[in-house]
Amino acid sequence: MITNQMAGPRKQLKAVFWLLCIVAGSLSFPYEAFCEAPDPYAAARQRMVDRQLKARDITDSKVLEVMGTVKRHLFLSGRYGSQAYADHPLPIGEGQTISQPYIVALMTQILDVKPGEKVLEIGTGSGYQAAVLSHFTDQVWSVEIRKELAQKASERLKTLGYERIKAKHGDGYFGWPEYAPFDAIMVTAAANHVAPPLLDQLKMGGRLLIPLGSTTYYQTLTKITKTPKGKEVEHLLGVVFVPMVGKILEE
């Protein structure tokens, strides 16, 4: 009898739930966390936040919240999805990787993006970092030099509801001048110098984050702030990133 009595209300609640999903989708809201079935990776994602981020030096509450919200496993394919919350980078195809969760969180924390700021990412990759950044501002642009990765990332971001992120295939060396200047630029590939167009497209007082150094061994994560006198440079920590390719290699 109890089961029969509950059946009607449960069906009604389910109908309301999916109606809300449809409405959220029509508003271009990042609704993947709301509309999907119970997330089998929720516990793994929380462990990642607790053990890899909080246990280190990720202290920004907003960064921790976003890292615990964005479903990293949806940005990976095949067998790598089950390893999404492990403490290391993972392959995404074409010799590229998705950075380990700690590095994504750290770079996001260092860049310190505020609501309404314009952010340019160089190296879309899987689209995960752009998705994370979009929770801080609704003005995110991203450039990926590898055409297939760019197409997959764009499709993935739209499917997951991140339609406000503007992504394109192109050489990140040249930035995205049509939308410049930017408050912040994040480069997610290693280079031995900063591409001049990127500095040109940075607002006065804006900051640029990039792994600088050898493109075959390791680099130093470096923060550059544009000032009236030129730039302020902060060398932060040693990292290992895949190399930036394209025009940058000709200089």
What function would you assign to each model-found segment?
Residues 2, 9, 27, 33-37:
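N-terminal alpha-helical modules
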Residues 2-19:
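Bacterial N-terminal signal peptides that target proteins for export
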Residues 17-28:
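Bacterial N-terminal signal peptides
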Residues 112-232:
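Conserved nucleotide-cofactor-binding alpha/beta core module
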